[in-house]
Structures are given as C-alpha cells and as structure tokens.
Amino acid sequence: MEIIKPISTIIIGLFLSIEFSFSSETNLIFTPFFSSTYYSSGSVFQPEKDGKTTITYFQLGAKKNTGAWSISGRFQFITATNLDSNSAFFNPDFNFEHRRGFYGSDNTWFESSSLIINYRNSEKFSVFFGKDRVQWGAGRSNLILSNHCPTYPLASFDWKISEKLNLQYFIASLESQISDSSQNELYSGRDIYVDRSIAGHRLKYSLLDKLTLSAIETVVFGNRKFDEHYLLPFIPFWSMQHYTGDVDNVQMCGEISWIPKDELKIYTSIFIDEWRPESTFDEQNRNWIGYQIGLKKNNFLQYNNKLLIEYTWTDHRIYRHKFSENSSYTYNFPLGFWAGPHAEEFIIIFNQKLGDWNFQSNISQVKRGELTEEMLDRQYSDPVIVYERYNGNLETRMIISAKAKKGILKNKLFLELEGQWIDWKNAGFDPYDSGRMGKDISKFSINLGLTASTQILFN
C-alpha cells in the first residue's frame, strides 16, 4: 500500500492541471476520478471501538452521445485498509462485487464496472442495455429495487404509453454466490455459481398532476439465464409462474407519490413477497410484507437546502426463498432495502448549501434481527410456525453525523470533514449465525476526505 500514496499525489496533480478539449463537435468525454477518505476510528467499516480505516477510489468514466444513441460507463478500483468486509452488508453506502487481497498484506482491493447503452428514438420510447442497476421507487432505499447493491447485466425498455401512463420492463442476470458443484469440476475446482435471474415491470399512472400511482412486479428465478415465460412484459408474472410449477419468487410492490405543494413530496409503498390472495385474511397467510413512508422537502425554512425523512420496515420472511437460488439477492446484497429482511430504519438527512460550502447532517437509527435456516424452514411449514419479531439475537446502531464539503480550484478538488457519533449494539453481528455475539461499542469518528475529478474531451 505504500506505493499508493505517491501515485495518489501524482494523480491529484494531473487532475488539477488537465482539462482537454479537441474540436467543437460532439464530444467523447473521459472523467478520471480519485477519492480517499480517512476514518479515525473506522466509522461503520469495522466493528471495533478503535482502529483507523482508509478507503481509496480510482475511477475512470466515459460517455458519448451520437444521434439517438448514448453510451456511458465506468471502471472502479478500490483499496482499503482495516476494512471488515462483512460491514458492507450493513452499510447503505458501500458494496462490492469482487474482493481480493494484496500479497503479504491484510489490505483489501475491489473492482467493479458499469455500462449503459441507450437508444431513444422519441420522447415516448427508449431501450437500454448494459451493466447497471434498476432503481424503482421514490425513497432513499426502495423496498423492491434500490441502488445499494452491485451492478448487474440487464436489458430494458421504457415506454410512455400516454401522457398519464408509463410502462417499464427489464430482465437481468444476478450473482447467486451458490456454488455449482457440477460445473466446478469442469474448471479445475474454481467456483462457478448457480444461475440466478430477475425480470420486472412497472406501470406508473399519473392520476392527477401531483399524484402518481405505481404498480411493480418482479420475479426471481434460478438455474437458468432466461425464461421465455418472463420475456412477455404485458402479462402478470404471478400468472406466468404457474407454467413453471410455482417454484419461482414473485414479488409485488405498490407505491403512492404525492406532491401537495411545490418543493414537497410525500411517498409511501408496500412490498408483498409470495402473496397468496386466497389466504390473505386467514390466520395461516402469506402476508409477508415490507413498508416505507417518507417525505422530501426542498427549501425547508430557507433556500438551497433539502430535507429527507424516511422510515422503512421489513418482515423477516421477505427476499429469501424456499429455494435459495430464487432469493432476491446479488453478491449476497439484497436488491431492495439495504438492511435486508427482519430490519427497520428511521433516518433524517438535511443538506444545506451556503456559497461554496455544502453541509449535511444525518440521524440514522437502524435495527436488524436473525435470519437463520430454522426461521426459513418455519415460514414454509404447514401449518406455519409463527416467529416473534426480534425474538433472538439482534443488532442496533445509531449514527449522528455532521459533514462539511468545499470545492476549490473550479470544483476540481473537494475537501470533506465529518464528525460521526456511533452507538452500536452487538457490532459484528451475523444474522445467519444465531450463536455469534458481537460487541457493544460507542465511538466518535473524525473522517477526512479528498476528491479530485476532471473531464477530458475528445472529438
């Protein structure tokens, strides 16, 4: 890791001095990016009271528009010191696809990439494919599809059917991280994973100018990349899965978004996993749900600020499936709410811009409980054996933070200073291992960040 420090210094110097532009036609834009943050007591990246953590990003992005086509992508390389990789599964701002270590060192590195190729021939219809995430919902961390998981290969379209009605569809390939022993033998013992895929469609209807209703349905299916039953975007997946033997994982979500006045949005959504309509009101039902309610307000009390207040709650029976290859995860990260099932979060985020300064303050209270195999077996038993919420080992964490950020040198360089107070009960908790106990810690972390970015334009 010693070599990274002089390299970082050189890169920052280049970013501050370079801004090329060749010719005046449509540009191919490259965006090199560097960021490094020091956490004095590890923040939420390691479940100890003491111990500094450093995370450094090297990234190269590119984009190009030509006619109806647009292409954008990025490659990202991350290095980290004193990072507990398990902490990423309880952190909304960090995820990874491929984790590696340096030889002769405990330090870690990760790499990831994304790409979107978009074709739009009119304001009413567009098609895109590549490697990215689908994010459906108005919230910070949506219940059914959020941006807190790693990217995945996908193909999608967006069709504005009328002024009030919009349809979106996608199909994607996920990473199950379930070893396929039959394939491993063919590749000299290397890990080859069972296929897992997802298809989804969303119908949005503008009931009034300020009221929007959304109906979302997804299906996660394993042991195959594609399934012709789910290539039909206009038919409910709940009905189509009967043709596959009712073995797949169908999930539904409804959302209401209301803008009662300018600069204010109120939203709420409900998520239902493996719904059985005929038993909805029975004692033995499958009302496995999650729900979310929140609001976003711009210019709260004064100008140039944003306020977000959000509460999210998830049942322990959602996302996971009787057949593990059909669970709603990729790289072991949930596709929806970042804390996963059997969890809840209340969060307030306030952003204020004052001149060249940006200030952000957060209050987050999050809790999550066990997700054992016994609990999974019990939810599918007949009759169902009821599990009392949080009846066992659990983890809670409160974070109160304040951050200041300032751009200098024409906003090519940003400096950040953040203070975090963290009260963490059962830190290091593993929801899949009921016998593993963590620590109760309270700590204050001072976080120092530096970010450099510029654009290089070609024609």
Where are these regions (language model features)?
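Outer-membrane beta-barrel channel domains
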Residues: 24-212, 223, 283-321, 325-342
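Exposed, low-structure sequence patches enriched in small/polar residues
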Residues: 110, 207-219, 224-459
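Bacterial N-terminal signal peptides that target proteins for export
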Residues: 2-8
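An exposure/low-complexity boundary signal
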Residues: 17, 131-133, 400-402
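Bacterial N-terminal signal peptides
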Residues: 8-19
